[in-house]
């Protein structure tokens, strides 16, 4: 395992640094501000800001941002989720300092040049159209809208054409939103690579402390809480698609919940992306009804959900749903044997180890753990906890989460 170091700046910015021998350093800033922190009339703001921060800062034009990173052979990227916005780059470690300066300038000193941001509005509008043309992607948004109905979690990350045009009218809209949500105490600086902790802290103090326009103030955002409806339901949308797209799922546990890891293992057994998962073996291998099928468990800060997604010929949708429910019932009614559990654990251990070879994913996962847990355990520590899970605990969670009355179903037919 690599050494991991932690430090907090006086203004509240958390720093996590993982020292590796790689010549490549991943450096980024994750902010605990995403779609669920928006009001309905400003939906899409977090994602809009993510785009606009590439369009110019006090020290860099839009072209200079890209040229600076690509000129040293690096890569820069960003993404928005329901709860976070992240900006990060990968460069050779000797360019760490200038890369952090660029990222900090983007996050702390954007200019929102109207000419540049208007171009980005067109780009995002096209992104919305593209998303609407992809049922395999759109169904995830519609499912979240369904399962989190009445909550800000139901809103799409991209926003709508109407809200995007509204929030892009004046630079003051995004600047005001950033002043409220891009707080230092909601930021994580993450660094992974062959640079010293002293270098990281010294650079962070210069870029994120002394130069930060966001000072700690008496600001207490309202706590975000979501209570799901006790009654699940089904919904069907008419879409002009060759296949029927199906998604079903229910609410699960939030980040840090004692049963979160049990749900993680249970989902891996059910349909977690391998060809030996129960759903894949049944619907693909045994019956040949789908090309692909998988499930995922998504923990959030105060809630969570899991879902199964598949696409099939319209005449097979009922059989596919029946087979999905059959596998869920099997997990509710029948405990795993010791042999089955050990096989599931061996499989998960290998998956975690292989996944850990992806340094980019490691760095991003480390940042998210730091944001919510204030520490970043490595995969070996996580797996050590998973190994303690019993068949009884798996069955208990299956009965809580997979209960028929709790399962929402969405179809594009």
Predicted regions and their residues:
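Short amphipathic
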Residues: 6-8, 233-239, 410-411
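His/Glu-based metal-binding/catalytic segments typifying zinc-dependent metallopeptidases
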Residues: 19-21, 28-30, 216-277
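Short, solvent-exposed loop/turn segments at the edges of secondary structure
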Residues: 22-24, 82, 184, 241-245, ...
């Amino acid at each position: 395992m690599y050494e991991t170091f932690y430090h907090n700046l006086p203004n509240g910015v958390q720093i996590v640094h993982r020292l590796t021998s790689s010549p490549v350093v991943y450096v980024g800033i994750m902010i605990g501000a995403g779609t669920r922190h928006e009001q309905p009339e400003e939906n899409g703001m977090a994602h809009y800001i993510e785009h606009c921060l590439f369009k110019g800062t006090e020290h860099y034009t839009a072209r200079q941002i890209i040229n600076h990173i690509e000129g040293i052979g690096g890569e820069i990227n960003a993404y928005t989720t329901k709860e976070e916005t992240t900006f990060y780059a990968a460069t050779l470690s000797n360019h760490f300092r200038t890369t952090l300066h660029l990222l900090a300038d983007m996050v702390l000193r954007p200019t929102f040049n109207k000419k540049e941001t208007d171009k980005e509005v067109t780009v995002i509008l096209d992104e919305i159209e593209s998303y609407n043309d992809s049922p395999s992607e759109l169904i995830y948004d519609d499912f979240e809208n369904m399962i989190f109905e009445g909550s800000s979690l139901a809103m799409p990350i991209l926003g709508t054409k109407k809200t995007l045009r509204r929030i892009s009218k004046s630079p003051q809209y995004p600047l005001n939103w950033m002043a409220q949500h891009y707080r230092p105490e909601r930021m994580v600086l993450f660094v992974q690579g062959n640079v010293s902790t002293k270098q990281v802290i010294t650079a962070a103090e210069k870029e994120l402390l002394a130069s930060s326009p966001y000072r700690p103030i008496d600001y207490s955002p309202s706590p975000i809480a979501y209570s799901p409806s006790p009654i699940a339901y089904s919904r069907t949308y008419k879409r002009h698609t060759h296949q029927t797209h199906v998604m079903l799922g229910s609410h699960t546990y939030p980040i840090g919940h004692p049963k979160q890891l049990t749900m993680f293992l249970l989902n891996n057994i059910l349909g977690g992306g391998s060809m030996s998962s129960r759903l894949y073996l049944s619907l693909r291998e045994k019956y040949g009804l789908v090309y692909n099928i998988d499930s995922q468990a998504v923990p959030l800060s105060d809630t969570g959900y899991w879902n199964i997604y598949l696409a099939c010929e319209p005449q097979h949708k009922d059989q596919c749903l029946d087979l999905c429910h059959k596998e869920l019932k099997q997990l509710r009614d029948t405990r795993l044997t010791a042999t089955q559990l050990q096989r599931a654990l061996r499989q998960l251990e290998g998956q975690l180890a292989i996944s850990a070879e992806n340094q980019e994913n490691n760095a991003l996962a480390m940042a998210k753990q730091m944001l919510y847990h204030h520490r970043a355990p490595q995969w070996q520590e996580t797996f050590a906890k998973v190994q303690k899970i019993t068949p009884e605990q798996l069955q208990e969670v299956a009965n809580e989460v997979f209960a028929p009355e709790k399962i929402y179903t969405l179809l594009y037919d």
